[in-house]
Amino acid sequence: MLEWKRVQVILIYQLFRKNMEDTFMVKITDDYKAKKEYFAKAGIKVPTYDQAEITKNTLAAPQWVHFGGGNLFRAFHAAIASHLIDAGKLNKGIIVVDTHDSSVISGVYNKFNNRMVRVITKADGSQDRELFASVAKAIYAGPATEDDSGFEALKKIFTQDSLQVASFSITEKGYALKDAEGNFYAPVARDIKNGPAKPENNMSLMVALLLARFNAGANPMALLSTDNFSQNGDKLKDSVMTIAKAWKANGFVNQDFIDYLTDENKITFPLSMIDRITPNPSETVSKALEKAGFEDYQIIHTPAHTNIAAFTNTEEAHYLVVEDKFPNGRPAFEDDGVIMTDRDTVNLADQMKVTACLNPLHTALAIYGTILGFKSISSEVQDPDLKHLIMQIGYGEDLPVVQDPKVLSPRKFIDELVNKRLPNPYSPDTPQRIATDTSQKMGARYGVTIQHYIDDPDRDPKDLNFIPLVIATWLRYLMGVNDEGAEFQPSPDPLWDDLHGQVKDIKFGDADQDVHEAVKGILSNKSIFGVDLYEVGLGSKIEADFKEMLAGKGTIRKTLEAHLAKESKDVE
C-alpha cells in the first residue's frame, strides 16, 4: 500500500512537472544559457557568449557607442555586434545612448537587462527570432541643464583611447540645427551662447564630448551616421562644425580644437547607406510571441510617444554600405555582411536607394496611403493604381538617371522592393509611419532626381510627370483633408504648423481657385526641395495637378487614374 502511494506521488509530480514545462513562459531576463531549451521552445535563438563578461570588457575599455536606441538599432546594429561577438571577432558590446526619451532607457533597456529579441517577418508568414545581449550599457543623455548625469557618464567614455566609433540612428531631424527660416532652434541658440558645460541639443552634446576627448589627449575616432538620408556623414560633420565654430567665436574653444575636428587622421565622418524597413512593434508579432511562450510580448507606448517593446520586428532584406574611414580602427563589420568600401561607392549606393530605388517610392506610398485611408504599405501595393504609380516613379523616372554603384544592382533592387519586400503582409509597416517628417525628406526623395534632369543636357525636368504629381499630392496632404473631404491626423513633422498654415485656407471643392499665392512659398523653398520648382519649370505643372485634386471627394484617386492613363511609360 505504501509502495503504491509512493508511485502515485511520483506520477503526480511527473505530471505536474510536465504541465509546468508545457505552460512555461520564458522571460527575456532569464538566464539564456541555462534555459536555452525554453527559449528554443519559444522559437528564440540565443547567443553563446557570456553577457556579464562582454559588459565587463566594454565598460573597462569602450569601443563602440551608439546614439539612438530605437527599433532600427535594435534590429540591425545590435545584431551586427551580437553576431561578431558570437563568432569570436569582437569581445565588447555597444554602449547605447538615447537623447530623446528617458523611458526607452529606464522602461525598456534597463528593465530587460539591455537585451532584445529581433523577429524577422518573412513573406511566407514564418518568423526568425533571435535574442541579442550585445548592449553593455544604456544611457539617457537628455538636456544637461535638466540632468547632467548622462552627459558626465559619456564624457568619461569619450576620454578613453579605446573608443573607436560613435554611430548614429537619430533620424534626419536629429542633425538639424535651424528652422525653415534659417534660425537656430532655441536649445541650439542657448548652447551656442552658454558653451559646452551643459548642452541641451544632441549635436551640442556631441561636440562637448569631442571636446572632452580632445582635452584628454586628442585621440582619434570615427563618427558614423547610419541614418536614412544622402550624405549623412557630411550632414553630421556640418552640424558638429557649426557648433564648434560658434563656440570658438564665443571664446569657449580654440583653433586647435577646430583643427582636431577637421584632421581626418583624428576625426572622420564616414558616409553610409542603410536599408532595413523596421516598423514599430507589431501587434501580430506580439501575439505570436505570447502564443509561443515569451512573457515579455507587450508593446510599450512611452509618454514621449515612442512605440517600443522587448522585441523588434523587421524585414529579412537588409543592406549597409559604409565608407571605410576609421582612424582608430573598427569592429570587423564586413564579417556580418556590411559592405565596406570607398566614399564614391557609398554615395552611389546611397543615391540609388534614397533618391531613386526605395525612398521615393516609399514616400509616395506614405502620402497617398494616408489620404486614401490605407493602414498598411503591403495593402497599398495590392492596389493596381498605387503599384503602377511607384513603378512609374522608380523604373520610369528615377532609374534612367541613377548611377550603378556596382556593389548593388539598381534594377534588381527595385525588383526586390516592388515584388517581394513591399507586398510582404507580415512586415507591418504603415504609410503613417513613413509619412513622419516628410518635409525633411522631399529634397532627397525627389529634388535630387529633378537636379539630375537639370544637369543632363539630354533631359528636361519638365518631362517628369509622376514626381510632380506626388509633390502636388503632398500639397493636398498638407491641407489635412483626405480624399473623402474629412480631416485626418497627420504624421509628426517639424514643419507641419508652418506648411499647413500656408495651405489651410484653400477651399476643398473648388478646382478653379487661384492657389499660387498659397503654395508658392512651399514650391520655391530650396531648403525643402533642393531647387526652386518654379525656376526649373515644374511649379505650374504641380499647381495644375494640385487643383485637380481640389474638385471634391474622390478627386485624388481620379487625378491619379487620369495621369496613369495618359502619361504612363512601358516599364515592364
Model-derived segments and spans:
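Substrate/ligand-engaging "lid" and interaction regions
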Residues: 21-572
